């Protein structure tokens, strides 16, 4: 199986839970042969007494019903995903032993050569040269609230970077569930790009980082040198768009009003220094009034003040840094 096709099936990641949390092959399921505590003990034994002693300890830690339970879970997953691979960090002893145990039970399975480390090195290599990005890239830009994301999603040729990063790409852009690790962000983005079937790629204009997720390698430079199309929307419509996305939809989806207010006040406080005390206090007062009165027009007032006092000034410095811009 080619590395670019690995996310087409749900592979079995045999590494410990903590290793898996740091990054994995997309769509993988974590069924560790050694859990966190066991992996730590085996690692200490390896440093003290070498490979043979570590392997022996591993076998003593995973035997009997524990071993049988593992084999059962692996087998059940393989029944649903017969083309899946097993992998550990380097494609070494953990995956070798797991394959042997399954083979001994009459279950045939392959492991990923070189393991997760090989996959990660391959992902990184895809971004080491800007010439690797061979598609015709088109960037959708515009001031905050101009509807770039909705416009982007109307095209089948698009990749939604903010969706992958689970962040709206702004000071108020934090989403529930947290962001993926940097490794997971790069893994998902790389596979999405390499499996993108169209000659043109449409992306939303983004900063070098989306929340905590950094665009890999030369990706940002490629965006900066690509054709830029700017969406123009009047201020009232922009405030309306932001209201529905950040307030109405959130409350309509069951988010508690007080929790949402506290979240946005925290985001506002993070940019207090850039706003200055007068503007900060004005937005804060309007925001409190809007949430307490549940008044759309007051919401739009604090949103518009935030747009014109912060976001527009920030974006205007970045908007025309690409090589070509069309309105």
Residue spans for each PLM region:
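Positively charged, proline/Ser/Thr-rich regional signature most characteristic
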Residues: 5-78
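Catalytic cysteine-centered active loop of the rhodanese-like fold, especially the PTP/DSP P-loop
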Residues: 58-113
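An accessory alpha-helical subdomain
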Residues: 66, 245, 253-314, 318
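N-terminal pre-Walker A segment at the start of P-loop NTPase domains
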Residues: 109-125
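Glycine-rich phosphate-binding P-loop
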Residues: 139-155
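Conserved nucleotide-sensing/catalytic segment adjacent to the nucleotide-binding pocket
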Residues: 163-216
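Conserved phosphate-donor/acceptor-positioning beta-strand/loop module used by diverse small-molecule
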Residues: 224-242
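Conserved small/polar residues in nucleotide/adenosyl-binding loops
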Residues: 320-327
